UniProtKB/Swiss-Prot annotation:
GO terms for biological process: DNA-templated transcription. This is DNA-directed RNA polymerase subunit beta. Transmembrane segments: none annotated. The lineage of its organism: Eukaryota, Cryptophyceae, Pyrenomonadales, Geminigeraceae, Guillardia. One of its GO terms (molecular function) is DNA-directed RNA polymerase activity. InterPro entries: DNA-dir_RNA_pol_bsu_ext_1_sf, DNA-dir_RNA_pol_bsu_external_1, DNA-dir_RNA_pol_su2, DNA-dir_RNAP_su2_dom, DNA-dir_RNAP_su2_hyb_sf, RNA_pol_bsu_bac, RNA_pol_bsu_CS, RNA_pol_bsu_protrusion. CDD domains: RNA_pol_B_RPB2.
């Protein structure tokens, strides 16, 4: 028997971290913040404004979630707070309910709708407020100790010892103050100080060295150190000390800071005392001195006991505080300026500061991110992400290896596998499967109690923080237990005080609840994970999030058992909220009648566009008359099948080299995958156009376009708008629009006509919305927004039209595919099915992989998966393999795979399925010749994904296009229709080859020699020889930049004189601009047959 009791239960709700935090904000955080600002008193003290934050109300949102997405508005509620204005002179009390701002509301999926787009607030991991001790060796090898007292808000205090054994205090990195001066200034007497220290003799050295002080002289000395140059007084010192450490508005340890301080220094200060107390300071100095005597221990700042998570609620609370601070200043100013008798709470309170603060946070904060909606797993992982970046966090450029590294305290809390590759590695992590966050923001992991080797795994698990866990001996979740739930092995691997070691079963205190509690959701979806190298498992986890939802989803034959919960918690599937019977089913609606006879309607999303342009489409999975139970999946979403996550397809793969087409991780695929739409996905693009009010008149949406033939308008309706259901190709008109044009926009012939006849050619130009290059598909929807309908439009816009185009993309050469084990590659060739290698029963292989991609990458899990998949296909079964199966015996994976292949061989009677001489390998035949390959080949059924990196979105070419204004070189990138950069290394290659004329041409007329460009074009049009290149524009820019630095620098032409002497003549590089008319191509030569102008 094994420790599977809890592992097989469902995991905790995976999006709870977001929802719980936002609920806390609504229930406590918001009220607490508003209360802390009340009352606001004016400078004379005769007016008081009280805000009753605990009685605030929220008004219902104006539109529902779907309507907000359609209209591009924010799904938010209005906050109203009861307020009371008291005039102390007259005793008049005015009461009103005041509006203080809009608050975006979280959807039940843990997201926010901001300006029509779904966004997620990422959890931030920061250093917890509290006190931290560290030791350092100075240059002479002597050990000095220091500690930092970090507050939630306000000054940081640093206590330090030096090589002379003196104790100092630093406030916010200012000058050092002797420790006893600081203690005396805080009001402690000599007796208090000596009684509070275990080693008072150590501090006496500081007394002797710096002299003794009374409270008054200590305050003056402290004021002099902190504010040098200002006249010091005792009152000034007291005010300075109060404002720095005792004013709750300026200094706040926070609930967490007080808890950590009490715990570290063994104090019993009440939790509601959030400011610094003299006991705190004395205890901090006592602990510092004790470290010198080897009592106590220093802290590890990377330990999860010293780092806490700030979720949505707390981040929002901080933002509301910023808004309230601004509001408080405005209220005080209005109390002073306005007539007291006419003042009311509503005239005092301006909601703009809070609205601006919240909008800034949701719109532009580093932690408010556009939700990754590629597939359900991407969505789920994004909500569970933990970032060390952002305001108050780290900077990726300055973060060292220590912060990024895996720490022993991450065990069961933060996944050691799933993190980005590149500059953010280690700074962005994901919560482990069973982890949760406690009220203080520390991450907790669950464990079962163990006593004398007996595991109590039928009771509720105990959640421990990283600090608590250090005190116990903890065994992993994959050790073997006997029938009575006792640990069956003599020696148990354990984690104790940051070390991994072994011990006897009776020494174990706790055991992990499941082998997968160490890793994240995405990583736990990889079968045979324990056989993969961590680097490849990381790629596998990240690439599952990039899988495109396919037209016909198929769940994996070999899974891990977590697919159903991942799909359910992502919110992509529709779940029945009550028991009942299905009374109506259609493509977009399901009705369930519950036991009371009430009908509950569930509306399905049909062909909605996700943030990443993939298609969200829900399909019913229940029949009319079917009985459903609470929590049952009644409709599948994108990339789910039967309520389980289905990111890819099960296809037949073979590991063999094939004519070099799978060199360097390239894939060779069967045309069946194209023709049978196995890897076809639907993508929805959004195009938008505005008709604006211009200085010359308003733009018009119309079918009457200048110089456009009827053929180009055939798909538009009478208003010039594309008809839904039309098929469009690149360059087709979607919305006809004309813009009035001014005199300067007229071409020369138009000016001539007006000069001769005074006739006005139609003075509008065609600015229609067209399908961009590479775009094609079916018109899915057209949405028209006007002010008359009550839609909110951008300033200056009269009408906004959005067109949605759906396109189905089959798999093609250049697309990226990957397995779940980090085995990724690009499709290099699509072979006819008759040419593919085939099995002894004639089945052609779907995908040919390179066997050299396995040994060096050490991701052997893919081999186990493909062989077990082959057995599953032949046995008509599906397997759920929980990672880390060695607890079932040595080489458990190999035994299982061989066993199942043998079983498949017996059941199907196909002897080739399992051969003892080379288990897992099969004689394969070449489809072109029909001959067997020389050696047996590993074949099997693997779960392969098509990733979002599609060649259609990346392929790009340019003939003519835009140039940069400054350097006059072609722009870069597909979005700008840019050119290919000929960089430094390419120049070296041409230099090495000696291709001087080719190089000169590339660096001048093909790039930024403006005069040469035009002359070359002219020469090509007229069929004349190409002229010599001129000076590149970038050279002129360089000259001008050097001249702007005050350097007298110029370009000179060397001329030979008749007497054999030479002289330099300065060349005017700007001459081209003054005589620019000469270099323009002649107008006649630039005419094409259709009388359209050509421009480079």
């Amino acid at each position: 028997m094994f420790n599977t009791t809890f592992a097989n239960r469902t995991l905790p709700d995976l999006v709870e971290i977001q929802r719980a935090s936002f609920c806390w904000f609504l229930n406590e955080g918001l009220a607490e913040e508003i209360q802390s600002f009340s009352p606001i008193v004016n400078y004379t003290g005769n007016l008081e404004l009280h805000l009753f934050g605990d009685q605030y109300t929220l008004r219902y949102p104006k539109h529902n979630i779907n309507e907000c997405k359609r209209r591009d508005t924010t799904y938010s509620v209005q906050i109203y707070v009861p307020a009371q204005l008291i005039n102390r002179e007259t005793g008049v009390i005015k009461e009103q309910e005041v509006f203080i701002g809009d608050l975006p509301l979280m959807t039940d999926r843990g997201t926010f709708i901001i300006n029509g787009a779904e966004r997620v607030i990422v959890n931030q991991i920061v250093r917890s407020p509290g006190i931290y001790y560290k030791s350092e060796l100075d240059k002479q090898g002597r050990r000095t100790y220091s500690s930092s007292l970090i507050s939630n808000r306000g000054a940081w205090v640093k206590f330090e010892t030096d090589r002379n054994d003196l104790v100092w205090v630093r406030i916010d990195k200012t000058r050092k103050i002797p420790a006893h001066v600081f203690l005396k200034a805080m009001g402690l007497s000599d007796t208090d100080i000596y009684n509070g220290l275990r080693h008072p003799e150590y501090l006496k050295k500081t007394f002797r060295f710096e002299g003794n002080y009374t409270t008054e002289t200590a305050l003056i000395q402290m004021y002099n150190k902190l504010r040098p140059g200002e006249p010091a007084t005792v009152t000034g010192g007291q005010q300075l000390l109060y404002s720095r450490f005792f004013d709750p508005k300026r200094y706040d340890l926070g609930k967490v800071g007080r808890y950590k301080l009490n715990k570290k220094l063994n104090l019993s200060v009440p939790e509601n005392v959030r400011v610094l107390t003299p006991q705190d300071t004395l205890a901090a100095i006592d602990y510092l001195i004790n470290l010198k005597f080897e009592i106590g221990e220093t802290d590890d700042i990377d330990h999860l006991g010293n780092r806490r998570v700030r979720s949505v609620g707390e981040l929002l609370q901080n933002q509301v505080r910023i808004g309230l601070n601004r509001l408080e200043r405005i209220i005080r100013e209005r109390m002073t300026i306005c007539d007291i008798t006419s003042l009311t709470p509503n005239t005092l309170v301006n909601p703009k500061p809070i609205i601006a603060s919240i909008r800034e946070f949701f719109g532009s904060s580093q932690l408010s991110q556009f939700m990754d909606q590629t597939n359900p797993l991407a969505e789920l992982t994004h909500k569970r992400r933990i970032s060390a970046l952002g305001p108050g966090g780290l900077n990726r450029d300055r973060a060292g290896f220590g912060v990024r590294d895996i720490h022993p305290s991450h065990y069961g809390r933060i996944c050691p596998i799933e993190t980005p590759e590149g500059p953010n590695a280690g700074l962005i992590g994901v919560l482990a499967t069973h982890a949760r966050i406690n009220t203080y923001g520390f991450i907790e992991a669950p464990f079962f109690k163990v006593q004398d080797g007996q595991v109590y795994n039928h009771s509720q698990p105990i959640y421990l923080t990283a600090d608590q866990e250090d005190k116990y001996r903890i065994a992993p979740g994959d050790i073997t237990l006997d029938e009575t739930n006792r640990i069956a092995t003599k020696i148990v691997p354990i984690k104790y005080r940051q070390e991994f070691t072994t011990t006897k079963p009776n020494q174990v205190d706790f055991i992990a609840v499941s082998p997968i509690q160490v890793i994240s959701i995405a990583t736990s979806l990889i079968p045979f994970l324990e056989h993969d190298d961590a680097n490849r498992a990381l790629m596998g986890s990240n690439m599952q999030r990039q899988a495109v939802p396919l037209l016909y989803p198929e769940s994996p034959l070999v899974g891990t058992g977590l697919e159903a919960q991942a799909a359910r918690d992502s919110g992509m599937v529709v779940v029945s909220i009550e028991d009942g019977q299905v009374t109506f089913v259609s493509g977009d609606k399901i009705c369930v009648t519950n036991k009371k006879g009430d009908e509950i309607a569930y509306y399905l999303q049909k062909y909605q566009r996700s943030n990443q342009d993939t298609c969200i489409n829900q399909r019913p999975t229940v029949w009319l008359g079917e009985d459903v139970i609470e929590g049952q999946v009644i409709a599948d979403g994108a990339a789910t099948e039967g309520g389980e996550l289905a990111l890819g397809q099960n296809i037949l793969v073979a590991y063999l080299p094939w004519e070099g087409y799978n060199y360097e991780d390239a894939f060779l695929i069967n045309e069946r995958l194209v023709y049978n739409d196995v890897y076809t996905s639907v993508h929805i693009e959004k195009y938008e156009i505005e008709a604006r009010q211009t200085k010359l008149g308003s733009e018009e949406i119309t079918r009457e376009l200048p110089n456009v033939g009827e053929a180009a308008l055939r798909k538009l309706d009478e208003n010039g708008i594309i008809v839904i259901g039309s098929w469009v190709e690149a360059g087709d008109i979607l919305i006809g629009k004309v813009t009035p044009k001014g005199e300067s926009d007229q071409p020369p012939e138009g000016k001539l006509l007006r000069a001769i006849f005074g006739e006005k050619a139609r003075d509008v130009r065609d600015t229609s919305l067209r399908v961009p290059n590479g775009g094609r598909g079916r018109i899915l929807d057209v949405r028209i927004f006007t002010r008359e309908k009550g839609d909110e439009l951008p300033t200056g816009a009269n009408i906004v039209i959005r067109v949605y185009i759906a396109q189905s993309r089959k798999i093609q050469v250049g697309d990226k595919m990957a397995g779940r084990h980090g085995n990724k590659g690009i499709i290099s060739r699509i072979l006819p099915r008759q040419d593919m290698p085939y099995l002894p029963d004639g089945t052609p292989v779907d995908l040919v992989l390179n066997p050299l991609g396995v040994p060096s990458r050490m991701n052997v899990g893919q081999i186990f998966e493909c062989l077990l998949g082959l057995a599953a296909e032949n046995l008509n079964k599906r397997f759920k393999i929980t990672p880390f199966d060695e607890m079932h015996g040595a080489e458990a994976s190999r035994v299982l795979v061989n066993e199942k292949l043998n079983e498949a061989k017996i059941k199907t009677g196909e002897n080739w399925l399992f051969d003892l001489r080379h288990p897992g390998k099969i004689t394969l035949y070449d489809g072109r010749t029909g001959e067997a390959f020389d050696n047996p080949v590993t074949i099997g059924v693997s779960y392969m994904l098509k990733l979002v990196h599609l060649v259609d979105d990346k392929i790009h070419a340019r003939s003519t296009g835009p140039y940069s204004l400054v350097t006059q070189q072609p722009l870069g990138g597909r979005a700008q229709h840019g050119g290919q950069r000929l960089g430094e290394m390419e120049v070296w290659a041409l230099e090495a080859f000696g291709a001087s004329y080719t190089l000169q041409e590339l660096l001048t007329v093909k790039s930024d020699d403006m005069q040469g460009r035009n002359e070359t074009l002219n020469a090509i049009v007229k069929g004349k020889p190409i002229p010599r290149p001129g000076t590149p524009e970038s050279f002129k820019v360089l000259m001008r930049e050097l001249q702007s630095l005050g350097l007298d620098i110029g370009a000179y032409k060397i001329e030979n004189l008749p007497d054999g002497q030479t002289r330099g003549i300065e060349v005017d590089l700007m001459m081209n601009y003054q005589q620019s008319r000469l270099f323009k191509p002649l107008y006649e030569s630039m005419q094409t047959k259709n009388n359209e102008n050509l421009f480079l």
